[in-house]
Amino acid sequence: QQVLAAFSADGALAKAIKGFSLRLVQQQMAEAVSDSISSRQNLVVEAGTGVGKTFAYLIPALLSHKQIIVSTGSKNLQEQLFYKDLPALLLMLGLSPKVALLKGRNNYLCQHLMEKELSGASSMDTQILDDLLRINQWAGQTTDGDLGGLTAVSESSQALPLISSAKETCIGQRCDHYDVCFTRKARNRAMDAQVIVVNHHLFLADKIIKETGFAELLPDPDVVIFDEAH
């Protein structure tokens, strides 16, 4: 079995991680997750510190080659999973599925609002204007518009709420930036990916939106994993 082989003494983890030692509890958890996926049954796992739960659920999920949504309890964990754990594991396992990170829309820069705010810059507070100019410079460099990657201004900057994407200010297809909209592109990537990393707030928001029958943020995957479900 591929899952057991990955955790074995000469498996993918042992070859890639210096000083790797087999942890029986981690292997047992991975087996339980694998069985749950293949039998399409729900599974609840309580894992103590040091078990290595992230690898224990990701490896069987990735090796199933099914469409997966991993939902985390915080944006910090979401980013660690997407930028660190997931790339490392895919490299170890020799896999290359399409992966996507999706956050709530207020985490993305709105080019329309950015343009609007800069057009009224003459009457603006100097600190806010300075921050807006820094954000605008970053906007020309970012590929995803995720404000989590913005380091040029403080997280508490008063400029951020002014240029964050919001349902209330979105003008949809009438927007000059519609084709390059960061929020729209992030959602399209998520719909097209095999592995999607979200947080609980977004996952549940998608469920509410789907109940209206008008829209959806996420696909209906084969596997959903809640990390930090408590």
Model-identified regions with their sequence ranges:
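Conserved helix/coil segment N-terminal to the catalytic DExD/H
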Residues: 184-191, 201-219
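Conserved pre-motif I regulatory segment
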Residues: 2-44
